[in-house]
Regions:
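Conserved SAM-binding motif I beta-strand of class I
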Residues: 71-76
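Short, glycine/acidic-enriched loop or turn micro-motifs at the edges of active sites
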Residues: 55, 79, 105, 126, ...
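A short helix-to-beta-strand connector/capping loop
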Residues: 70, 93-96, 169
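S-adenosyl-L-methionine
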Residues: 1-67, 78, 83-115
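S-adenosylmethionine
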Residues: 110, 114-172, 178-179
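Post-transcriptional modification and biogenesis factors for structured RNAs
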Residues: 17, 145, 188
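Core SAM-dependent methyltransferase catalytic element
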Residues: 175-188
Length: 188
């Protein structure tokens, strides 16, 4: 089977190719969605920790480091995707840490350890996949229980048909942008 790749599109690692895991088990962030996020928040990454929940290939975490984040994490439960993310991290450097495990268990612990403000990028598998019917509810509960003083921003990539609440715990919806079947909602 032919390898799939994505390219870092901006910053100091611009042009670097990263391996993608199987599209059977992961859903890579669309280029237009990735571009919109980094166009909006590129200059706010400095001095921040970026956590990519449901990390897949760790592309968003690598792009965040490329654009000035101090440290980045990608959390991935799928073993094959995790192995690919580890390979990609070797291309980026020690600032990109790949964590194997359940996002809902690992992310709060990673957030709690941080001394710098956190940008959390939630990119769960769309709920149309088997076994993921309650994934959005779990993501909302995860965000609701995070400490406000540690979180700078929560970006939530989701199916456009989903209407997220105006408030999730201490976090308020800043804006939402639609890209066909995918939307990005920002909370602070």
């Amino acid at each position: 089977m032919k390898n799939l790749y994505a390219t870092i599109s901006s910053g100091k690692f611009k042009g670097k190719k990263l391996l993608l895991p199987s599209l059977q088990t992961t859903r890579s962030t669309k280029s237009i969605v990735k571009g919109s996020f980094f166009d909006s928040f590129r200059y706010e990454l400095a001095g921040k920790v970026f956590i990519e929940a449901f990390g897949g290939s760790a592309l968003m975490a690598a792009e965040a480091l490329s654009n000035g984040a101090t440290k980045a994490y990608a959390v991935e439960i799928d073993k094959n995707a995790y192995k690919i993310a580890l390979q990609n991290a070797k291309l980026i450097g020690d600032e990109l840490e790949i964590v194997s495990g359940d996002t809902f268990e690992m992310t709060p612990a990673i957030v709690a350890r941080q001394n710098l403000p956190v940008i959390l990028y939630l990119d769960p598998p769309f709920d149309i996949r088997d076994g993921f019917a309650d994934v959005y509810e779990k993501c909302v509960n995860l965000a609701r229980n995070l400490p406000k003083d540690k979180i700078y921003l929560i970006a939530f990539e989701h199916a456009s048909h989903l209407n997220l609440p105006e408030n999730i715990g201490a976090f308020t919806l800043l804006k939402s942008k639609k890209f066909g079947n995918t939307s990005l909602s920002y909370y602070s």
